[in-house]
Amino acid sequence: MSAYIRLFKDIRIADVPSVGGKNASLGEMLAFLSSEGIRVPDGFAVTAAGFWYYIDSNNIRNAISGLLGKLDREKFSNLKETGKRCRELVLGGKMPEDLGVEILAQYRELGGGASDAVAVRSSATAEDLPEASFAGQHESYLNIQGDKPLLEAVQKCFASLFTDRAIKYREDNGFAHEKVALSVGIQKMVRSD
């Protein structure tokens, strides 16, 4: 396994800095509830290192920092435009080939194919702030099927680090933007019936 992918079965709460609270909790549930007969859908996480690799491979870190550095922190008059431009930079990037290959290989291991749906869920991480909660600030996508839609959903999750509400939340709570990354959980969908 690379630094960019972690299986839920190998993730524990101590991994919050790498995979975020949501993915760490899923790893804990899979590890400790499965033996009690509680079924937890399997999955894997694209780590914060994978997020930064995507950002740096597309050479957009400085551009994003520049945009966030010009944010009007008093009235937030340019918040909407700042968020939009940051998201456009992320969505305009290209998935690094090796990262895409790793994601798709794990998707196949999970049983992913044209008819197998997964949830693609954001899980934010904050360096040196494992207690930080970003619940509800970032996007998740359900019933994703197929290679291209999966990679697009991962990119959309990465971009959701820069929604207006996520930027404002970090500003309101004193989190430095460059210290927050996004991990993405990819988990089997299960039918409710």
Each predicted region: which residue ranges?
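N-terminal beta-alpha lobe that positions the nucleotide/phosphoryl donor
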Residues: 1-185
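Short, intrinsically disordered, charge-balanced linker/junction segments flanking boundaries
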Residues: 189-193
